[in-house]
Amino acid sequence: MQTFKKIILAFKFSSACRSALEKAIQLSILNDAELFIFHALDYRLIGRDQRDSDLIELNQQMEQKFETEIKPLIDEFPKFKFGSSPSDPALEICKIAHRIQADLILLGCHDEPEKPRLARLDYVGMTILEKAPCPVMLVPP
């Protein structure tokens, strides 16, 4: 049985990603793996100075949102890291996966309210599937 040592979750603060978060936590605990949770900030902020007030404020908002919404779910699991930065989400996830030699990337599938039984993958997900340096798991909502 293959075990995973480094797992990345491409995370967006949405209901679609909640299922992926739960699966990522489950797999990380089961495999005693490191869990990297990455949230891409608005790509239009790429290249801004790290001292830019808009960027600082956005990073603080993401950290606070993580602390209140996500950290309580993984508080007892010490092997996690959360990161966010302005980036193209798909390319950044693939870069991180390559850099840390990830064993698995998890993605949540988007749901369409008018088609409740249909899950779909958007451009970000398709790009990750095409460029990922490791296996990718799609998690339905």
Tell where the protein language model's regions lie, with residue ranges.
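Short, glycine/charged-enriched secondary-structure capping and boundary segments
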Residues: 22-25, 50-53, 97-98, 119-123
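Structural beta-alpha unit
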Residues: 2, 73-105
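A short acidic, glycine-rich active-site loop
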Residues: 54-65
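Active-site phosphate/pyrophosphate- and oxyanion-stabilizing loops and adjacent acidic/basic residues
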Residues: 25, 71, 94, 126
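Gly/Ser-rich helix-loop-strand patches that form or flank binding pockets
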Residues: 98-141
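General small-molecule cofactor/ligand-binding pocket signal
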Residues: 36-38, 81-85, 137
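A generic structural signal for well-ordered alpha-helical segments
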Residues: 28, 74, 97, 128-129
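Small/aliphatic-rich secondary-structure junction motif
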Residues: 2-51
